[in-house]
């Protein structure tokens, strides 16, 4: 599930300049094509440059993903029981988790393509499901549906369903178990610790790559 989620997220990106009149399927296709064009030509992103990957994620996905709705749905009844401080802390860490997952996926792109299925939507509808299929060279295609909700300014994504498994449902099950056993504060702390560890690892990796570059240049000159 996680590998397929990573792949789906790597192909999902929503433009800051999307028009409110743009349909959900048009938005998905246009912006997915845009982000794939960047990834195909950016060797640093393909090599896993976390700084560039996170910058791309922050620019493209954050303003156009309904993190508030996702957070409420993922926590379920625990959202209504949470304090304002807990809600804020959870949203910060969960948002970071999703961006980090997206960033990891972005560096794993290897010439996948997307096929878009025809979409039917009733006039005046405020929710929509955009159905796609990710085609992998030498591999089985993966069915991915993006669920969007119409906001005053534009359509925004609030769930991704991969081969019948919902991102929201998947995380809700994981988080509910931790909350039952140890409480919401424990979940928030675990997410924060995981995010910090990943950030430190990324910083170390980027530093190592930067230090290696001059050495390689010197070696070539010799």
Language-model segments: residues:
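N-terminal signal peptide c-region/cleavage motif recognized by signal peptidases
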Residues: 15-18
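Low-complexity, intrinsically disordered terminal/linker segments enriched in charged
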Residues: 159-222
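Sec-dependent N-terminal signal peptides
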Residues: 6-10
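Short beta-strand edge/turn micro-motifs at domain boundaries
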Residues: 143-169
